[in-house]
UniProtKB/Swiss-Prot annotation:
Keyword Repeat attributed: yes
Gene Ontology cellular component annotations, sorted alphabetically: cytoplasm
Protein name per the record: Eukaryotic peptide chain release factor GTP-binding subunit
tr-type G domain span: 272-498
Organism: Kluyveromyces lactis (strain ATCC 8585 / CBS 2359 / DSM 70799 / NBRC 1267 / NRRL Y-1140 / WM37)
Superkingdom as given in the UniProt entry: Eukaryota
Region annotation Charged: where it falls in the sequence: 137-267
Gene designation per UniProt: SUP35
GO terms for biological process, alphabetical: nuclear-transcribed mRNA catabolic process, deadenylation-dependent decay; regulation of translation
Length: 700
């Protein structure tokens, strides 16, 4: 007996309980379909079934009118082929429901029909031969041609099983080896008819879908029903769709984060890298005047514009301030002679491109200064050598000390200290006055944490006349200084390495509405291209980069870390964004937390710090109210060894490790992973009380 017949024998077990046809099934199981066809009682048995179809019972009553063309010619049971078992599957279900009272058909619907349907799906060898020998009705070939023309308009759905989806079904059918190509004409005809019927049998039942975990193996069960098989196909098709979507997202992320050749980036900007510098210092130290003169000396502002500002300043009674008007464009700033917000300007030299950040010097605007310092690479601390002004700015609680401390906290590790106004009549390029200023500042900068020998340089300049800015100081005026000018030193100093191929990250410094939503900030890591998809944290909003503007307001296709940019974005409204939000890579989003462990150094505190102490935290461009919830350790001076017992409180000069909790989620990282997003400043009542760094992120 052939393997196909053995399989048919197992699938025909349901017919054993089909009492009226028991004798035919016995021959069928022994000899295959050929033996069954040889029984003389077969036509009579099927005629009994035909007679039943003529009775007006249930849904079966409409069977004959609908299928009259294909059904009536079947006078023999053997000639029914696919029609009885597979094509008419839907009517068999109704037939079984209404015929359950017949003893001879009671068990047919439970087992017999499933076996028959599985039998038809196999298409055994020699199955079509008996139909050709039938003496009643049309031939099988004629019927197949007729059925093919009737169902030709019905397309066959194609559902593919996605093996990569990771979804497995309980009781799923074990995969069957692919069938070999059949050459027999009658078998090909049978397959054509079966294709038309398969469209109906593959319609899924959603309620039957059972999905197990990907790690669980398939459960081996008996041969599944047609509904289970079709459900498996449908589920697999859906899984394939979702998998394809995930793959496309991964491909998009991979594409936008492809490595960028640093040589290509240099060629884009003529071989010039970009540096952000911030002018800091006490009010009236001459920061804006020095910045304006730098723009004029480098050709970023033409002579006609400067002459216009000079006339306007003279008319306003501010003749000596005209150079500062290049930076201070606000009317209030010009009238009061002091900077209120961080001014921005751009200039180029033969070697580098620069962005000037002009920070306000008044203590009322320290928050703005912190935001500017967080975007700077190099700090220029402007000190007025004029008698009275130096003492006010440094020795009597001025902003010089606080600005230097905040710059170090915000990651400005390179400091240029320019002793300004050396041409003032009260100074006259006096070396003794210069040395006095340098001596006091050196000790203070060491205490703040600067390596004075490597990271700090001092130089005498005149911001108003331009002496020492672009060209070196005239030896006639200052014979005792032979060092470089400010621009000379900036062009030749070593800058920090840029992580061009790191995950993209841009803390938002400001926002505006300009033909859409526009955000501004410095790219801290990675790079960005027009059309990239990014993630806005902490809202987790997906946004698209529509336009990129560089420092010169020019539209570009790409920007890299270290650059100050403006981005027009799509997917979020301007009012939904706040300073301190971070545009980040979807693949490596920045952490969004409310609790973390930090190392804190208290620099100025009139009272004490204990559990429950509240203050304001400045971290990158974010400002957030925080509470010190727990004091964990006290750090010993010099060794930084942790105390075994937590301290009850902390005071000025102490270093501690504590748990800090924010009122709202804030975008941060540990200092070791991303220093720019892991260091912060604590302020209370307008005073900087502590600096710190995040050592551990706690789960919310």
């Amino acid at each position: 007996m052939s393997d196909q017949q053995n399989q048919d024998q197992g699938q025909g077990q349901g017919y054993n309980q089909y009492n009226q046809y028991g004798q035919y099934n016995q021959y069928y199981n022994q000899q295959g379909y050929q033996g069954y066809n040889g029984q003389q009682g077969a036509p009579q048995g099927y005629q009994a079934y035909q007679a039943y179809g003529q009775q007006p019972q249930g849904a079966y009553q409409g069977y004959n009118p609908q299928q009259a063309q294909g059904y009536q010619p079947y006078q023999g049971y053997n000639a029914q082929q696919q029609g009885y078992n597979a094509q008419q599957g839907g009517h068999n279900n109704n037939y079984n429901k209404n015929y359950n009272n017949k003893n001879s058909y009671n068990n047919y619907n439970k087992q017999g029909y499933q076996g028959a349907q599985g039998y038809n799906a196999q298409q055994p060898t020699g199955y079509a031969a008996p139909a050709q020998s039938s003496s009643q009705g049309m031939t099988l070939k004629d019927f197949q041609n007729q059925q093919g023309s009737t169902n030709a308009a019905k397309p066959k759905p194609k559902l593919k099983l996605a093996s990569s989806s990771g979804i497995k079904l309980v009781g799923a059918k074990k995969p069957v080896a692919p069938k070999t190509e059949k050459t027999d004409e009658s078998k090909e005809a049978t397959k054509t008819t079966d294709d038309n019927e398969e469209a109906q049998s593959e319609l899924p039942k959603i309620d039957d879908l059972k999905i197990s975990e990907a790690e669980k193996p398939k459960t081996k069960e008996n041969t599944p029903s047609a509904d289970d098989t079709s459900s498996e196909k449908t589920t697999s098709a859906k899984a394939d769709t979702s998998t394809g979507g995930a793959n496309s997202v991964d491909a998009l992320i991979k594409e936008q984060e492809d490595e960028v050749d640093e040589e290509v980036v240099k060629d884009m900007f003529g071989g010039k890298d970009h540096v952000s510098i911030i002018f800091m210092g006490h009010v009236d130290a001459g920061k804006s005047t020095m910045g304006g003169n730098l723009l004029y000396l480098t050709g970023s502002v033409d002579k006609r514009t400067v002459e216009k500002y000079e006339r306007e300043a003279k008319e306003a009674g501010r003749q000596g301030w005209y150079l500062s008007w290049v930076m201070d464009t606000n009317k209030e700033e010009r009238n009061d002679g002091k900077t209120i917000e961080v001014g921005r300007a751009y200039f180029e030299t033969e070697k580098r491109r620069y962005t000037i950040l002009d920070a306000p010097g008044h203590k009322m605007y320290v928050s703005e200064m912190i935001g500017g310092a967080s975007q700077a690479d190099i700090g220029i601390l402007v000190i007025s050598a004029r008698k009275g002004e130096y003492e006010t700015g440094f020795e009597k609680g001025g902003q010089t000390r606080e600005h230097a401390l905040l710059a170090k906290t915000q990651g400005v590790n390179k400091m240029i200290v320019v002793i300004n106004k050396m041409d003032d009549p009260t100074v006259g390029w006096d070396k003794e006055r210069y040395d006095h200023c340098v001596g006091n500042l050196t000790n203070f900068l060491k205490a703040v944490g600067y390596n004075v020998k490597e990271d700090v340089i001092f130089m005498p300049v005149s911001g108003y006349t331009g002496a020492g800015l672009k060209e070196r100081v005239d030896p006639k005026d200052c014979p005792w200084y032979t060092g470089p000018s400010l621009l000379e030193y900036l062009d030749n100093m070593k800058t920090t390495d840029r992580h061009i191929n790191a995950p993209f990250m841009l803390p938002i410094a400001s926002k505006m509405k300009d033909m859409g939503t526009v955000v501004e900030g410095k790219i801290e890591s990675g790079h960005i291209r027009k059309g990239n998809q990014t993630l806005l944290m902490p809202n987790r909003t997906s946004v698209e980069i529509l336009t990129i503007y560089n420092e010169t307001e020019s539209e570009v296709d790409m920007a890299v870390c270290g650059e100050q940019v403006r981005l027009r974005i799509k997917g979020v409204e301007e009012e939904e964004i706040s300073a301190g939000f971070v545009l980040t890579s979807p693949k490596n989003p920045v952490k969004n937390v409310t609790r973390f462990v930090a190392q804190i150094a208290i620099v100025e505190l009139k009272s004490i710090m204990s559990a429950g102490f509240s203050c304001v935290m400045h971290i990158h461009t974010a400002i957030e109210e925080v509470t010190v919830t727990r004091l964990l350790h006290k750090l010993e001076k010099g060794s930084n060894r942790k105390s075994k017992k937590p301290p009850a409180f902390a005071k000025k000069g102490m270093k501690i490790i504590a748990v800090i909790e924010t009122n709202e989620p804030v975008c941060v990282e540990t200092y070791d992973d991303y220093p720019q997003l892991g260091r912060f400043t604590l302020r209370d009542q307008g005073t900087t009380i502590a600096i710190g760094k995040i050592v551990k992120i706690l789960e919310n």
